[in-house]
A protein has these predicted regions:
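Short extracytoplasmic/periplasmic juxtamembrane "stem" segments immediately C-terminal to an N-terminal membrane anchor
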Residues: 76-93, 240-254
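Alpha-helical transmembrane anchor segments
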Residues: 2-33, 173-254
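Structured inter-helical modules in multipass membrane proteins
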Residues: 86-175
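Transmembrane signal-anchor/signal-peptide helices with a preference for the extracytoplasmic
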Residues: 57-77, 230
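Loop-to-helix transition at the N-terminal end of transmembrane alpha-helices
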Residues: 36-51
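Short alpha-helical hairpin
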Residues: 26-34, 54-62
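Hydrophobic membrane-insertion alpha-helices, especially the h-region
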Residues: 50-61, 214-222
Length: 254
């Protein structure tokens, strides 16, 4: 299911087909047994309640997706600030250790920029492995001076490095924070039920075929937008590493 949700265009296509078929099935039921006028009022009430519930669930999912997007963007900025702060605090270390820390931070920054820009899964695994090793090296680079000279000044550099490593963990957690699968399942189930009811309850008219497309298109576009915003790498809407890239240009003088 995660694979599908990471491809918003596939979500759009599948939901449009499924919802249109649901309305068509509802319309076929109506041909077998048409609604009586005495039943139509109660049926309209049920259909309206179902569509209202669908709207509420879509709004809830959209709110979650936007919240996750904003969280990922905030943690990208926090990562850049933490790396910049530690890069400056490296001057507090002995000259040899400071040079090593700055070199490692530059490499680490490059990997974080690649993490945000890369879409290839195999390349991402390489980036993750390299980043994990760099985190170990970065901590070792400040651990040695801290053990040798446990002064308040050195402690500032250690604290800054701790912020760098923690900011990466916070960013990862934000990327994993997605709209839950059960919420998607509930939305799909209610949408299918709603479209079945619409197909069953729609009266015969010349424009019936066109009307049958309206709700599936609207709901499918909503699903597409939620999936696009919620997927960190899929679709059209991504988190550009603006702050990390700006920091990289500043450090490298580009």
């Amino acid at each position: 299911m995660n694979y599908v949700l990471n491809l918003p265009l596939l979500v759009l296509t599948l939901s449009l087909v499924a919802l249109w078929l649901s309305e068509a099935i509802g319309a076929s039921f109506r041909k077998r047994r048409n609604l009586q006028e005495s039943e139509r009022e109660g049926f309209s009430l049920v259909a309206a309640a179902t569509l209202t519930l669908l709207g509420l669930i879509i709004g809830f999912a959209f709110s979650m997706a936007i919240s996750g997007y904003d969280q990922r963007r905030s943690y990208e900025e926090a990562e850049a600030n933490a790396i910049a702060t530690e890069y400056n605090r490296s001057d507090l270390l002995p000259a040899e250790d400071a040079a090593r820390v700055r070199a490692l931070l530059r490499n680490y920054l490059d990997q974080r920029v690649l993490f945000y820009e890369t879409r290839d899964e195999r390349e991402l695994r390489k980036i993750d492995a390299t980043t994990t090793q760099l985190k170990t090296d970065l901590w070792s680079a400040v651990q040695g001076p801290a053990v040798a000279r446990p002064t308040p000044v050195i402690a500032l550099a250690v604290s800054g490095m701790n912020d760098v490593l923690n900011s990466k963990g916070n960013a990862d957690a934000a990327w994993w924070n997605r709209v839950p699968g059960p919420a998607w399942g509930l939305m799909a189930a209610i949408a299918i039920c709603g479209n079945l009811l619409i197909g069953y309850g729609l009266r015969n008219s010349e424009g019936r075929a066109t009307l049958l497309l309206v709700l599936p298109v609207v709901v499918s576009i909503s699903f597409f937008l939620i999936s696009d915003i919620d997927s960190p790498r899929g679709g059209l809407i991504h988190i550009p590493p603006q702050n990390l890239t700006s920091l990289s240009r500043s450090i490298y003088g580009r």
